[in-house]
């Protein structure tokens, strides 16, 4: 029996049955009172007010508070060097490598945040948190440890006022984007910015409990716990959390975008909507009618974000927008807010195009409203567009240049028409993006990087073999040759297939074993959606038949 078969059987053995399922607990801070939700894998089972007595172990959350202190007090970076001396380094880095603050928070590297290593004095720590009226457990370094039990209410209180939380929220988006948490970003988008935690359940060393705590994108504190590790909680309950967690519609990025409206069309005059008198240059508030020199006209609304300028006798309309409002307005102009999955994919493409193509002027990005770049609605974004944009706030698709078109579909260009069709077939936004941009990866605005280290020689070898194998494979029930896919280098662990992103992860491409791994993972993708695609014996037998034929 090969290792793939062993891993598959172990996974089946360890999966909990519905009868054994312990409800997931989710707490959201509300305007009037905090709400406690109990969730099963199929939905909400109970909602009640949060009892003051509900407690939680801190688990790994203590690291978030050290991170906040380091950021807020502007402590210099002190990288942790991995030397292979501690088993805890598995959460940090490989021997010979080092890890910095942001990455340590995402990976939950406790060795980095150890107060003794960072020379954090108990008096300095206590004074800092006492000045901020923090809970007693937070003001004492001796109680800042995983086993410390605190009330969930006090935890939410501390998160609501946590210093440097904007920076922490930005960095913690990488937790959701972790490629090992398959399906989480697909279901939750960028709505949660959380630090994961795991600990022992009720002091029973053999039973784990885990979850996460942090914020929604609008700053609402939340806390979650369930049976298993934080990773299993996230992956198992991502679908139901998607249905329960709200989507804020008024979210700002703090990044400004300056847009010259109607950049390619000379303006003749601007009037109030029900007037024929041209308005003077200045900030615009209200409904206006712009007339172009070609005789066409359009009505738009400004709430002070758009200014009429006159430069060398030529009129110019310039809007000063938050980045996420800009994305929503482009969605309104270039596409629609429905179907949702296509719209979500479009917002990521729009945001990525902006990052790749905008110029900078001071603190703002600058980009013209033009069919040569991106067309922008002159009026405020619709609620639907803002909702779709908020769902993917800060997400980009890092890697190769990104383009999109209304109807034309080519590699590197997302077709809106095709995206709507894919959404109609049940594909999620990340699958739509993966089809259009197979070599790119979901990433965040502040740290654009592709998680797929491409193996072009492996992909070229597979592309050459596919026509040769077609005669054999087309005779197999369930075979569906994938149109696009990527072959990526595996950083650690066993080779695997990310079916949603259509990515094959293998260690390298030098040996016969590498070719066996690549073929094996390709077959998992080619038989995706059919029972044989999950049959390790079938896939392994077919792999050897293809390579030994």
Curated annotation (Swiss-Prot):
Entries under InterPro entries matching the protein: Beta-lactam/transpept-like, DUF2300_secreted, SpoIID/LytB_N
Recorded superkingdom: Bacteria
Signal peptide: 1-19
Residue ranges the record marks as coiled coil: none
Keywords annotated in UniProt: Signal
Annotated source species: Escherichia coli (strain K12)
Keyword Cell wall biogenesis/degradation recorded: no
The protein's name in its UniProt record: Uncharacterized protein YfaQ
Pfam families in the record: DUF2300, SpoIID
Tagged with keyword Protein biosynthesis: no
């Amino acid at each position: 029996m090969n290792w793939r078969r062993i891993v598959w059987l172990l996974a089946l053995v360890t999966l909990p049955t519905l009868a054994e399922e312990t409800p997931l607990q989710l707490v959201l801070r509300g305007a009037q009172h905090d709400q406690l939700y109990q969730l099963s894998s199929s939905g909400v089972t109970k909602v009640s007010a949060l009892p003051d007595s509900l407690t939680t172990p801190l688990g790994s959350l203590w690291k978030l508070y050290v991170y906040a202190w380091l950021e807020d007090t502007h402590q210099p970076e002190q990288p942790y060097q991995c030397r292979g001396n501690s088993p805890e380094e598995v959460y940090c880095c490989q021997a010979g490598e080092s890890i910095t603050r942001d990455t340590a928070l995402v990976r939950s590297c406790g060795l980095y945040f150890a107060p003794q290593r960072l020379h954090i004095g108990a008096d300095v720590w206590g004074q800092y948190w006492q000045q901020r009226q923090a809970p007693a457990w937070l003001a004492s370094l001796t109680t800042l440890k995983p086993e410390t039990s605190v009330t969930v209410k006090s935890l939410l209180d501390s998160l609501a006022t946590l210093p440097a939380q904007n920076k922490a929220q930005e960095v913690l988006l990488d937790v959701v984007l972790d490629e090992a948490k398959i399906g989480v970003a697909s279901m939750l988008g960028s709505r949660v910015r959380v630090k994961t935690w795991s600990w022992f359940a009720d002091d029973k060393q053999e039973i784990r409990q885990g979850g996460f705590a942090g914020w929604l994108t609008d700053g609402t504190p939340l806390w979650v716990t369930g049976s298993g590790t934080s990773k299993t909680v996230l992956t198992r309950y991502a679908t139901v959390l998607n249905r329960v967690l709200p989507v804020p519609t008024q979210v700002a990025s703090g990044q400004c975008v300056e847009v010259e409206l109607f950049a390619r069309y000379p303006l003749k005059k601007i009037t109030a909507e029900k007037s024929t008198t041209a308005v003077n240059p200045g900030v615009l508030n209200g409904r206006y009618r712009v007339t172009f020199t070609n005789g066409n006209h359009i009505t738009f609304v400004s709430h002070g974000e758009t200014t009429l300028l006159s430069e060398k006798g030529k009129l110019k309309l310039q809007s000063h927008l938050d980045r996420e409002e800009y994305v929503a307005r482009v969605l309104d102009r270039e596409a629609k807010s429905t179907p949702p999955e296509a719209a979500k994919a479009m917002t990521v493409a729009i945001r990525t195009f902006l990052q790749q193509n905008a110029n900078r002027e001071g603190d703002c990005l600058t980009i013209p409203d033009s069919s040569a770049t991106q067309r922008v609605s002159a009026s405020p974004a619709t609620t639907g567009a803002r909702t779709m944009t908020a769902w993917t706030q800060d997400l980009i698709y890092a890697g190769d240049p990104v383009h999109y078109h209304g109807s034309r579909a080519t590699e590197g260009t997302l077709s809106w028409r095709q995206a709507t069709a894919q959404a109609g077939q049940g594909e999620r936004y990340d699958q739509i993006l993966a089809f259009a941009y197979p070599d790119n990866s979901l990433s965040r605005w502040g740290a654009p990087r592709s998680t797929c280290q491409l193996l072009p020689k492996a992909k070229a070898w597979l592309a050459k073999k596919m026509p040769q194998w077609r005669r054999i494979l087309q005779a197999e029930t369930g075979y569906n040759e994938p149109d696009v896919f990527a072959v990526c280098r595996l950083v650690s662990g066993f080779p695997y297939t990310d079916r949603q992103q259509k990515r094959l992860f293998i260690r390298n491409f030098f040996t016969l074993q590498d070719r066996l791994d690549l073929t094996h993972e390709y077959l998992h993708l080619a038989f995706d959606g059919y029972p044989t695609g999950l049959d390790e014996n079938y896939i392994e037998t077919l792999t050897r038949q293809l390579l030994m034929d």
